[in-house]
Amino acid sequence: ISKLPVDQIVQVQQAVSSGENGMGGFGPVQDGVILPDMPLQAVNEGSAADTPVLMGTNRDEAKLFNAVPNRPPLDDDQLREQVGQMLKSDAATTNRIIQLFADSRAAHQLPASNHDVVDIIQTMVGFRVPGNRFAECLSRHQPKTFLYLFSWESPARRGDLGACHALDMPFVFGTLDAPTQDRFAGKGLDAENLARNMMDAWIAFAGCADPSHPGIGNWEPFERHKRNTMIFGGECLLT
């Protein structure tokens, strides 16, 4: 590959990055030598049985990647086309999925425009569903599997970013006071309390493989048939 022209590499990169789920197409490649099994298959068979894991996703991961200036409007036909291509679903299934997510967001008092719907479906396809599948496979062998969903919303772009990709990082690492961070992560007592609860959870997990602490209470592990998930947002709640 080092002998290929840069333009040709970039052309291939652009083709792969415009993957079906809109989030890029790069991933592990099973070659039978360096990577004998696909990661999810290996975890499902117990390759990580000795490793406790604390993992999670943000509610609106895709909104950060889709936050382009002057984002083009998305009408109903374009929404159906994008979702159908993303999920490889027929028209009836596509319509049901779109309605399901639109209704769910509205029920939770979240914006439910066509852009919001395609964003949440991209988030599910690219982040949350793969994460949940990993947790399902790992929890078969490792009882200390802990899952979270981050729902704190960014004030940036008049709130259009929602709980986007990377927004959890300043809370986990305690950098809310970094220059200009308040524009992205917010500020105030609620933000500080959330950061404290998340940092204490990560510290507790690092110390004894259990993220429970007085600020959030008992954090029960994730199980395939009891999908315990800690919600980190305006309040911390195990669901």
Locate the predicted segments by residue.
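Short coil/turn segments at secondary-structure boundaries
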Residues: 13-15, 24-28, 95-101, 110-115, ...
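C-terminal, loop-rich substrate-recognition/catalytic regions characterized by aromatic stacking residues
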Residues: 48-104, 154, 170-173, 189, ...
